[in-house]
């Protein structure tokens, strides 16, 4: 019978050990301390005895991201140092550029100049953005807060969570929910069960819960995040969009119109001015408005209309082609304009009526353009969708179409009704002027000053 195997313990292991074994044991024991204490201490910028800092990220053009710029300005007024990071395709307002507390950090806008397939370009764009965003996070490390907007949240939400977890654990994450990323992606696929759409929804649902604070633009969105995404209600605050100080009723309206090139070939005493602003994206169907104006053109006893459409985007060329094909008479004049941040609010204030064709990919966001119109005291006609009544009160500050009716006929009917009924126009104009009294600064301070008050 063979010799019985005897337990000898681990003493024999030390016969083959050396400094390398002690080194490995030391590294293993020190890893948690290194990851959770030493690295953050080394890489965290020393901001002791300094005022608080927030880094605001916008994966879009800063000049056309008013809500995020308003946030930056509001934090500045609380004496925060603000890193405002985003695309600089158009210059932000002077209020932002001239603010000594706000540092604008450009992010390169990556465009598909080589006409790559959508998936290939999307992957390339995400990879390049990851590098740039990480670089900015590194340079601005140690911020008290990081704020991002959603959408878009790919790839920035994941990058920020990883960065703050490893290198900036005291930094708090704020997500400003303008809409839902997956519903916008669904405009491309028109299938909520598409794998990409479901993946993006899961991305938002899981990673969004890492935020210390979620801000929503509507109460409907807050309810959605609680019910569908399982967010904690206590971590969600609704902050309605309100106009900035630059959006005001224009006292010298006729003088401005007589000097601006948009109105130079128009008899401003005869024409009613209709204005809509857009990004020319698929979630706004301008054929509804153009076909409605064709119907209006054939309606007797109605005043002539000047339609001004401001903005730019992928479908602008198609819009202009449609205008040419419709061959409007002098009764309907259509102009497209890309306005500076200084001219835009003044031109809006010249309108007799605003038009919003926004229908919302999610049904729970609201168009900023209507807020801008109200700031200038201009009533609106809006298409109907679930959350619109949180902003537009029918026959009080505007008119809302009947969603069960043909939308082209509805828009034509409402525009005709407003421009042939002076009493109705005066009434909704008064309602819009009443809305203009509610401003961003007061609303933001009332909601957030106690949360973000700089006590350092």
From Swiss-Prot:
It is a single-pass membrane protein. GO terms for biological process: dolichol-linked oligosaccharide biosynthetic process; protein glycosylation. GO terms for molecular function: chitobiosyldiphosphodolichol beta-mannosyltransferase activity; mannosyltransferase activity. Disulfide bonds: none annotated. It comes from Candida albicans (strain SC5314 / ATCC MYA-2876). Keywords: Endoplasmic reticulum, Glycosyltransferase, Membrane, Signal-anchor, Transferase, Transmembrane, Transmembrane helix. Its EC number is 2.4.1.142. This is Chitobiosyldiphosphodolichol beta-mannosyltransferase.
């Amino acid at each position: 019978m063979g010799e019985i195997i005897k337990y000898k313990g681990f003493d024999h292991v030390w016969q083959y050990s050396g400094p390398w074994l002690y080194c490995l044991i030391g590294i293993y024991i020190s890893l948690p301390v290194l990851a959770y204490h030493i690295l953050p201490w080394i890489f965290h910028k020393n901001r002791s005895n300094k005022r608080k800092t927030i880094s605001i990220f916008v994966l879009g053009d800063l000049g056309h991201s008013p809500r995020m710029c308003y946030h930056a300005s509001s934090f500045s007024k609380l004496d925060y140092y603000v890193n405002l990071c985003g695309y600089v395709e158009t210059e932000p307002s002077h209020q932002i550029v001239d603010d000594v507390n706000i540092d604008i950090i450009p992010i390169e806008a990556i465009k598909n100049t080589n006409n790559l397939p959508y998936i290939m370009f999307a992957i390339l764009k995400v990879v390049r953005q990851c590098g740039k965003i990480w670089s900015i996070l590194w340079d601005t490390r140690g911020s008290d807060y990081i704020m991002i907007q959603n959408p878009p949240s790919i790839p920035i939400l994941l990058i920020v969570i990883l960065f703050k977890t490893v290198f900036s654990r005291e930094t708090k994450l704020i997500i400003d929910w303008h809409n839902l990323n997956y519903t916008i992606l669904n405009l491309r696929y028109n299938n909520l069960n598409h794998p990409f759409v479901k993946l993006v929804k899961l991305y938002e649902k899981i990673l969004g819960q890492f935020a210390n604070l979620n801000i929503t633009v509507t109460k409907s969105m807050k309810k959605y995040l609680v019910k569908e995404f399982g967010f904690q209600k206590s971590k969600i605050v609704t902050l309605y969009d309100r106009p900035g100080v630059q959006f005001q009723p224009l006292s010298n309206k006729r003088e401005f119109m007589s000097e601006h090139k948009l109105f130079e070939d128009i008899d401003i005493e005869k024409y009613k001015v209709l204005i809509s602003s857009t990004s020319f994206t698929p979630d706004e169907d301008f054929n509804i408005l153009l076909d409605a104006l064709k119907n209006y053109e054939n309606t007797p006893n109605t005043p002539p209309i000047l339609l001004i459409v401001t903005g730019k985007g992928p479908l602008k060329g198609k819009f202009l082609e449609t205008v040419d094909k419709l061959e409007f008479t002098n009764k309907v004049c259509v102009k497209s304009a890309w306005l500076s941040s200084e001219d835009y609010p003044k031109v809006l204030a010249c309108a007799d009526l605003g038009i919003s064709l926004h229908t919302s990919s999610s049904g729970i966001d609201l168009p900023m353009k209507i807020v801008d119109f109200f700031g200038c005291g201009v009533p609106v006609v809006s298409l109907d969708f679930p959350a619109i009544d949180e902003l537009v009160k029918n026959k009080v500050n505007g008119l809302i179409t009947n969603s069960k009716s043909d939308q082209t006929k509805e828009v034509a009917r409402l525009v005709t009704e407003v421009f042939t009924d002076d009493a109705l126009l005066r009434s909704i104009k008064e309602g819009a002027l009443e809305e203009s009294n509610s401003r961003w600064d007061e609303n933001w301070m009332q909601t957030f000053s106690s949360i973000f008050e700089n006590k350092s």
